[in-house]
Design a protein with these regions (language model features):
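A broad, structure-centric signal for solvent-exposed, well-ordered loop/edge residues
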Residues: 7-8, 42, 54, 320-323
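Short hydrophobic "helix-edge" motifs at membrane interfaces and signal-peptide entry regions
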Residues: 8, 38-40, 304-306
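Outer-membrane beta-barrel porins/channels
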Residues: 24-30, 167-447
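N-terminal, post-signal peptide beta-strand-biased segments of exported outer-membrane/organellar beta-barrel
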Residues: 20-173, 178, 447
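Bacterial N-terminal signal peptides
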Residues: 8-17
């Protein structure tokens, strides 16, 4: 049991790193981290604005690197402190250890240690106060109670991990990889009051959690076109569009409701609580008939002297039809029971529409910019800039994340011929604390 728990924790950590990097690719690039998440180069903007494939690079700005390689100082430190060979006895992963802190473990998953934490956000302790009477139960989680989400909590969005293609005179033909993932849950009112507000447990009452998760992935043959329709390189109007034929390789969705119901007495009787759960799963596994759908990207960009403005929208009308889906139901109440509901049925899913509005101002070796980005799970705002002085680049930025919290980024880099070394710092409060931590990111860029 201990070995499997530790192994699952390490696997979750690795998946967390991959998910973070995939969902927000800038997390592996110290340049964008130093800008607070702002993407100033055309390579970053092309992801969300099809018109930018025709927009020339800004004068005086470094070109886009051919390859960015993160330097994972955080993982090196993490596995030095938590050797895999001793994972089953490590207090961080061994739930039987007196030093085990599940809040700290979850915090590690929410902030995968790809890079080095130079200031860790304080993690609430295990201190919990129980009030137990003859027929009453009350739990005071102390500082940890602030971490209990009051509203629906979730992560996810859409990403394009691969997008190779060939361009000829504004026409581009390629194959795009796509992934859509969503995970969310919400505490029932009774359980929320019990955990967050220390409301005493009541008899004959159900305490539950609602959950929902979606994962689908595939590829999309793409035809795109971008060109300047007015002006010249210094003052011009650019438009672009892309048509995708989405091919779905696999799809899964789970919706569930789990909890327990108290009896006539909190502690008396043979069954003081009765656990129960129900779930509905839909899936089209790899090897079934492919999903299919059509969607489009649209973009426009305006360049007028030192000012650049763009608006891009992705996955417009992208509805995926899965022709061979199976639906199962599962129920637990005293014992588990599952049964097929339907098979070989058609299911439709919809990719979230993402958009980016960006503004940049370049004068000499100074570039300032801002953007508003929504990739399917809330809106983020980035403002930042960089100053180039010879081989040195200085960067800084500020962001408002999806939870409307303000974060900061700063950093710099050195460029020697075709090789660049960058370092970036950013604050984060997505850990299980109301105070900020600071992470240092490092990466190599090959131009």
């Amino acid at each position: 049991m201990r070995t499997s728990f530790g192994g699952a924790a390490v696997l979750a950590l690795v998946v967390g790193c991959a998910t973070a990097a995939g969902a927000q690719g800038w997390l592996t690039d110290a340049r964008r981290i130093g800008l607070g998440g702002l993407g100033l180069d055309q390579g970053s903007l092309r992801r969300y604005n099809a018109a930018y494939r025709a927009v020339p690079g800004r004068a005086g700005q470094h070109g886009r690197p051919k390859l960015t390689i993160p330097i994972p100082l955080g993982l090196i430190q993490f596995f030095h402190d938590h050797p895999i060979s001793n994972i089953k006895n490590d207090p961080a992963f061994n739930h039987d250890s007196a030093g085990f802190n599940p809040v700290k473990l979850l915090n590690t998953f929410l902030n995968p240690p790809l890079f080095l934490e130079v200031k860790q956000a304080p993690t609430p302790t295990n201190d919990v106060v129980f009030g137990i009477g003859k027929d009453s139960l009350r739990v005071d989680l102390g500082q940890t109670a602030r971490l209990v989400p009051q509203d629906q909590f979730g992560i996810g969005g859409s990403s394009r991990p691969l997008d190779p293609g060939l361009s000829i005179k504004g026409v581009r033909v390629g194959v795009m990889g796509w992934v859509h993932d969503e995970v969310g849950f919400q505490l029932g009112d009774k359980l929320l009051g019990f955990l967050r507000d220390s409301v005493p447990a009541d008899t004959n009452t159900r305490y539950n959690v609602l959950g929902d998760a979606v994962l689908e992935a595939g590829f999309a043959p793409t035809v795109a076109y971008a060109r300047r329709i007015a002006g010249d390189n210094t003052t011009g109007l650019y438009v672009g569009g892309a048509l995708h034929y989405y091919v779905g390789l696999a799809y899964a969705r789970v919706s569930g409701d789990g909890g327990f119901t108290t009896g006539d007495s909190i502690f008396g009787g043979p069954t003081p609580v009765k656990p129960d759960a129900r779930a509905l799963t839909q899936y089209s596994k790899f090897g079934n008939s492919f999903g299919h759908g059509v969607g489009a990207d649209l973009g426009i960009a305006v360049v007028t002297g030192p000012i650049e403005l763009g608006v891009g929208v992705n996955d417009v009308g992208a509805t995926i039809t899965w022709p061979d889906t199976r639906v199962d139901s599962a129920l637990y109440r005293d014992s588990s029971f599952s049964k097929p509901v339907a098979n070989h049925i058609e299911t439709k899913t919809k990719l979230p529409v993402s958009y980016l509005v960006n503004l940049a101002y370049t004068v000499g070796k100074t570039t300032l910019g801002a953007d508003v980005l929504n990739s399917g799970r809330g809106t983020t705002v980035h403002i930042g800039g960089e100053q180039r002085v010879g081989v040195i680049v200085l960067r800084g930025g500020v962001a408002r994340d999806q939870r409307k919290r303000i974060e900061f980024g700063w950093g710099g880099g050195l460029r020697f011929g075709g090789l660049g070394l960058d370092v970036g710092f950013w604050t984060h409060t997505n850990s299980l604390s109301n105070q900020r931590g600071i992470t240092m990111a490092t990466s190599l860029a090959i131009y």
